[in-house]
Amino acid sequence: MAGTGRVPLWLVATVGGIAVITVLGIFIYGSYSGIGSSL
């Protein structure tokens, strides 16, 4: 998998970081809204 060079590492890190921030944001927002307790 390493050394193929098809997907830049910075692109993976950027997409992964945005996904993590989005999930955390939804979870925190859900906690304040009372939805996070059901998760």
Swiss-Prot record:
List the InterPro entries.
Answer: PSII_PsbJ, PSII_PsbJ_sf
- Asked whether the keyword NAD is assigned, the reply is no
The annotated topology with respect to the bilayer is: Single-pass membrane protein
Report the transmembrane regions from the record: 9-29
User: GO terms for CC?
Assistant: chloroplast thylakoid membrane; photosystem II reaction center
A Gene Ontology biological process in which this protein takes part is: photosynthesis
Give the UniProt subcellular location, in the record's own words. Plastid, Chloroplast thylakoid membrane
Location (main, coarse): plastid
Q: Say if the entry is tagged with keyword Ribosomal protein.
A: no
Keyword annotations? Chloroplast, Membrane, Photosynthesis, Photosystem II, Plastid, Reaction center, Thylakoid, Transmembrane, Transmembrane helix
Per the entry, what this protein does is:
One of the components of the core complex of photosystem II (PSII). PSII is a light-driven water:plastoquinone oxidoreductase that uses light energy to abstract electrons from H(2)O, generating O(2) and a proton gradient subsequently used for ATP formation. It consists of a core antenna complex that captures photons, and an electron transfer chain that converts photonic excitation into a charge separation.
Q: Which family does it belong to?
A: Belongs to the PsbJ family.
Summarize subunit and interaction data from the UniProt record for this chain. Answer: PSII is composed of 1 copy each of membrane proteins PsbA, PsbB, PsbC, PsbD, PsbE, PsbF, PsbH, PsbI, PsbJ, PsbK, PsbL, PsbM, PsbT, PsbX, PsbY, PsbZ, Psb30/Ycf12, at least 3 peripheral proteins of the oxygen-evolving complex and a large number of cofactors. It forms dimeric complexes.
Name the record gives this protein: Photosystem II reaction center protein J
Query: Which species is listed as the source?
Result: Gracilaria tenuistipitata var. liui
